[in-house]
Regions:
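Solvent-exposed coil/turn segments that connect beta secondary-structure elements
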Residues: 50-52, 97-99, 107-111, 126-129, ...
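Periplasmic polypeptide-binding modules associated with outer-membrane biogenesis and secretion
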Residues: 32, 39-53, 72-126
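N-terminal membrane-targeting segments
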Residues: 2-78
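Solvent-exposed, non-transmembrane alpha-helical starts
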Residues: 70-74, 112-117, 154-161, 205-208, ...
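Periplasmic/extracytosolic POTRA-like scaffold domains at the N-termini of outer-membrane
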Residues: 50-87, 142-164, 227
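N-terminal positively charged amphipathic segments used for targeting/anchoring
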Residues: 1-37, 190-207, 216-253
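Extracytoplasmic segments of membrane-associated envelope/inner-membrane machinery
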Residues: 105-181
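Extracytoplasmic
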Residues: 42, 87, 97-101, 116-121, ...
């Protein structure tokens, strides 16, 4: 009997010991979770960007809008190759400076054009998503005219009356990035025909059929064409690469 009582006491003692260990483990895990959640609260983002299109404030506002709040989790996901998708960037890396601060080094998405509404510039990407809204104009990005917009909202795709017009515009703005000539403006009419303005030449590209060849042909004749002021008709592709340039000083027949 005495031996049985001793065994029971030992078992109870061991059980109490394991219960204590379990409680301590649970509390430790809980404290760790609390520390991760509240001890790594993202408060500031510094940036190192390749194009300088977005300000530090714009990036911070975007990060908040996306609900990225935990510094450690944001950094770990980036290191593990499972980064949060950020519309502003093609690719990026995250460096954790402190529990409250990170530095993002990124390759920005190239802004393809802008629409000016009431002196506000709405800049969009290759998908027609508005990525920047500003009162300042960025050099080297073409102005877009002729597109009737129903709604322009930051981080949303442009809502337009004619989807064909938008698609043709996006085809042109994306394709011209391959070439070095500086396009000042792109106009798209209601028939989805595009005209780009380079120097003093209005280049009529028409619809987006054979667009790549038209742009290659224009690139080949670029140095000769920009000497003049006028309209270059490239609405229909030419097999031999020859097109008609109507100079501004030529009188209409």
């Amino acid at each position: 009997m005495k031996q049985r009582r001793k065994l029971k006491r030992r078992r109870k003692k061991k059980l109490r010991k394991w219960v204590k260990v379990f409680i301590i483990a649970v509390l430790s895990i809980a404290l760790l979770v609390v520390a991760v959640i509240f001890g790594f609260k993202l408060q500031k983002v510094d940036t190192k960007l390749d194009l300088g299109q977005f300000t530090n404030k714009e990036v911070n506002d975007y990060i908040k809008k996306e609900g990225i709040e935990n510094t450690l989790w944001f950094w770990l996901k980036n290191k593990a190759g499972h980064s949060d998708k950020l519309e502003l960037f093609e690719d990026y890396t995250v460096k954790m400076n402190s529990p409250f601060k990170v530095t993002i080094t990124a390759y920005e998405k190239k802004l393809k054009g802008y629409i000016n509404v009431n002196k506000i510039y709405y800049y969009f990407d290759e998908n027609g998503v508005i990525l920047k809204q500003s009162t300042e104009k960025i050099k080297g990005i073409p102005k877009i005219t002729g597109v009737e917009c129903n709604n322009l909202t930051l981080y949303k795709k442009m809502e337009v009356k004619n989807k064909k017009v938008l698609q043709n515009l996006l085809d042109v703005t994306t394709s011209i990035q391959e070439y070095k000539y500086n396009v000042k403006r792109i106009d798209v009419n209601k028939d989805a025909e595009a005209t780009m303005y380079v120097k003093d030449v209005a280049v009529q590209l028409g619809k987006n059929s054979n667009l790549d060849k038209k742009l290659r042909d224009f690139n080949d004749m670029y140095d000769n064409v920009i000497k003049y002021k006028g309209t270059l008709n490239m609405k229909f592709v030419s097999e031999d690469g020859s097109y008609t340039l109507k100079k501004a000083d030529e009188k209409s027949k």
